[in-house]
Amino acid sequence: MISYLKGNPIETLKNTQNRILLILEVNQVGYEMQIPSRFARELSQNPRETLQVFTHLQVKDEQPILYGFATAAERELFRQLVSVSGIGAQLAIALIDTLGLEELVQAIVNGNIRTLSQTPGVGQKTAERIALELKTKLSQWRKLVGITLPSTSAIPSLEVLEDVEMTLLALGYTNEEINKAISTLSQDNQMLKNTNSEEWIREAIAWLSQ
C-alpha cells in the first residue's frame, strides 16, 4: 500500500469525465491521480517544485485508480466516507470539495443534514445515512487529528442558519462565501443572541459586499 508520494507536480488537468487529475513525477515515473478541486486550486495559487501527496489506491473493474489528498486527515476522511453504504469515491470527493475538511466533519458530528445536502448528489436520505454511520467514529477521530468544533452556542440556531443559507444561495452566493459570512458573524456575541433571520441575512449581505 502506498501511503504517500513525494515528487514534482507536472500538471493538473481535467479528463473527459470532468475529473481533475494531477500528474506527479516521482523518480522519473509519472503517477496520475484524481484530486479534489480544492487541492487543485491550492496548487495553482501556491505552485511548488516538490509536493507530498497522500494517496489512496482503489481497484475498480480490475483497474487501479489512485486518489491524492493534501493531508493525511483528508485522505482518512475520504476512506471513512467511502465505507458508508452507497457512497462512492466521486461522491466522497464531492463532499470534501463542497464543504472542506473541518466543515464536513462538523456537519457529520452535529448531524447537520441540511449542510451535508448542499453537496450535489447528496439527498436527505444519503445525508442521514452518512451522519448515522460516521457520527460516533468521527467524534473520536477528529480529536486525534486536532480538528476542533465550535460549541453549539457559538453558532446561530438551525432555523436561522437555514433561512440565511436559502436566501443567500438564491441571491447567487456560493456555499463557501455563505459559510465564511456566518462564521464571521458568529464571532459577535450580540449576533448570536439574535434570532431574527432577516437581520442575519442583512448583516451577511453587508459583510459579503465589503
From Swiss-Prot:
Extract the ranges annotated as region (Domain I): 1-70
The record's subcellular locations are: Cytoplasm
Task: Give the CDD domains listed for this entry.
Answer: UBA_RuvA_C
Q: Name one GO molecular function term.
A: four-way junction DNA binding
List the GO cellular component terms: cytoplasm; Holliday junction helicase complex; Holliday junction resolvase complex
Among Gene3D superfamilies, the record links this protein to: 5' to 3' exonuclease, C-terminal subdomain, DNA helicase RuvA subunit, C-terminal domain, Nucleic acid-binding proteins
Query: Which residue ranges are recorded for the region named Domain III?
Result: 160-210
- Which is a GO BP term held by this UniProt record? DNA repair
Q: Can you tell me which residues the record assigns to a coiled coil? A: none
Name the domain of life: Bacteria
Q: Fill in the domain comment.
A: Has three domains with a flexible linker between the domains II and III and assumes an 'L' shape. Domain III is highly mobile and contacts RuvB.
| Similarity section | Belongs to the RuvA family.
Q: Could you identify this protein by its name?
A: Holliday junction branch migration complex subunit RuvA
> Source species, please?
Rippkaea orientalis (strain PCC 8801 / RF-1)
